[in-house]
């Protein structure tokens, strides 16, 4: 494992700031687990009420190989914490990230546009022109078949802490219709639960944007590889790095061979 990632892992949850991060992650993961279970029950209930069957199943991975996957800062911090507790999932992500990053480099224009508009879309603040621009760039991104680096053999390696955007939608159509090239794709039926993300559990220090969304694999990797430096790049969180790196416990850890 790269030295910078190992170091960031060692100092992530020590000292006053680190303990605040860890408390947040533990509470957030626990809360999100309950919310996700409620989402799953709601989707199952709504499908049954419509006399439909949810056709999503482990091993498919079509959505994970097509769609842009966004997550909030809170979700990405929780994923990082979970990865630190699950060594094989962490190692696999680090092995696959470069391939994913190389693919999104070719999609930089549409990805940047999506990142700029995603928060407005999720919070229903986008204009009609912005909605059209968002959909156009999403179509461009989806046509590239960029597989999520957390997908392995059609299954999510971080399923327990997967983003809400992944948990909130299911297909009611035959699985083969999910393919972009399938002639019946436009006839697909989806079932979706809208989450009030504006009311999601806030980060333990509130960033200036209020709710920060990013391409999930990118922000997760940034936190793993850059640690507090990545968090300090977020408006409103600049002080975190200074507070953490001057903490006596962190300084003592840094002096260790």
Name every feature range the model reports, one short phrase each:
Residues 1-257:
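Short loop/turn segments that flank or connect secondary-structure elements
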């Amino acid at each position: 494992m790269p030295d910078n990632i190992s170091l960031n892992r060692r100092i992530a949850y020590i000292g006053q700031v680190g303990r605040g991060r860890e408390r947040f992650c533990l509470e957030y993961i626990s809360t999100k687990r309950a919310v996700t279970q409620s989402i799953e029950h709601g989707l199952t209930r709504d499908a049954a009420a419509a006399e439909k069957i949810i056709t999503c199943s482990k091993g498919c991975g079509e959505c994970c190989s097509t769609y842009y996957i966004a997550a909030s800062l809170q979700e990405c911090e929780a994923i990082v914490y979970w990865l630190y507790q699950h060594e094989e999932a962490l190692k696999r992500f680090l092995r696959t990230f470069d391939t994913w990053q190389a693919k999104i480099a070719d999609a930089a224009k549409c990805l940047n546009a999506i990142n700029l508009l995603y928060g407005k879309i999720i919070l229903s603040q986008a204009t009609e022109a912005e909605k059209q621009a968002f959909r156009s760039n999403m179509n461009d991104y989806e046509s590239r078949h960029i597989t999520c680096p957390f997908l392995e053999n059609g299954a999510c390696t971080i399923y327990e802490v997967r983003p809400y955007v992944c948990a909130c939608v299911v297909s009611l159509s035959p699985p083969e219709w999910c393919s972009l090239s399938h002639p019946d794709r436009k006839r697909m039926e989806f079932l979706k639960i809208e989450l009030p993300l504006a009311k999601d559990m806030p980060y333990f220090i509130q960033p200036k944007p209020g709710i920060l969304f990013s391409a999930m694999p990118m922000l997760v990797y940034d936190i793993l590889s850059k640690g507090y430096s990545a968090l300090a790049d977020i408006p409103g969180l600049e002080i975190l790095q200074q507070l953490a790196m001057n903490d006596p416990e962190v300084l003592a850890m840094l002096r260790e061979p």
